[in-house]
Amino acid sequence: MLYLRDFMNEVQAFPPTFFVRGIPIYGNAILAPMDGYSDWPFRSLCRALGSAMSYTEFVKVEKILSRSKEPAKRLYYEEAERPVTFQIYGDDPDLILKAALTVQELNP
């Protein structure tokens, strides 16, 4: 059985297709952000089928800062999914900054 981490080890034997801010991207397909669909199982399946990069579902900054369990579920990713991009949103720049610094600890 081929696991996602094994697949990524094989892919990374080739040079990256392009870079995003110095992060190597291996492949041509990028999974578009889709709220309500881009959960961890779906992203893992797409990764196994050739997606080179993916996005989490949207997470409201107030929920991140409240430390509720919902954001952790929406931002969960496996190491083999890298690179993965977190999507956060809100209307208060100060809260957006605080939430961004909070999720940065997860090393997306």
Question: Predicted segment positions?
Answer:
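Glycine-rich, positively charged N-terminal anion/phosphate-binding segment
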Residues: 7-19, 34-108
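An anion-binding catalytic pocket shared by soluble metabolic enzymes
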Residues: 31
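N-terminal, post-signal-peptide segments of secreted/periplasmic proteins
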Residues: 22-23
